[in-house]
């Protein structure tokens, strides 16, 4: 019996102290909650973490503005020098300082102002086409107390006609025409007045022609 009482007392004492500790802990928690203080300031940032993995490529953005011009590049080497072929030439200018000869025949001019290519025949008064192409032909007439009627002919066909008369004064008349010629075509001036109709006074006639461009 005494042994049983002792064991019962020991168990009762242990339960008593457990109860005391539980109450004490509960009271301490209650006091801590009632007397809590505000949190302190944030601490300094921690060190950076290690870089993460690269993300997926983003969508294509709009085009940007043009960039500034670049600096000029170095000067290139000189190009090759080639000899250009000379342009074909055909020209003449002739003059007559007297009354025209008999009508309806080529006027034979006495003075060659230019005939370097030799395409105008001074003996016959005719220009012979050597270089086919487009030509400009013209004549210039100066009169004093005289009259003329001149026509420009091509292979026997009249192309242009000019009439001028100066009684007691000087007069100036001129004419020109552009036409295409083939090789061998002939061009000349001829008078339509008889020599007796224009023998008095002074007459100067200049006849000229030149190639504009070849065919």
From Swiss-Prot:
Tissue: Plasma; synthesized in the liver.
Domain C1q positions: 85-215
Region (Disordered), start-end ranges: 29-96
Residues annotated as signal peptide: 1-28
One of the record's GO cellular component terms: collagen trimer
PROSITE patterns: C1Q
Pfam families for this protein: C1q, Collagen
Gene Ontology annotations of biological process type: hibernation
Localization annotation: Secreted
Annotated disulfide bonds: none
InterPro entries per record: C1q_dom, Collagen, Collagen/C1q_domain, Tumour_necrosis_fac-like_dom
Ranges where the Collagen-like domain occurs: 40-81
Keywords: Collagen, Glycoprotein, Hibernation, Secreted, Signal
Protein's job: Plasma proteins HP-20, HP-25, HP-27 and HP-55 form a 140 kDa complex via disulfide bonds in the plasma and are hibernation specific.
Protein name: Hibernation-associated plasma protein HP-25
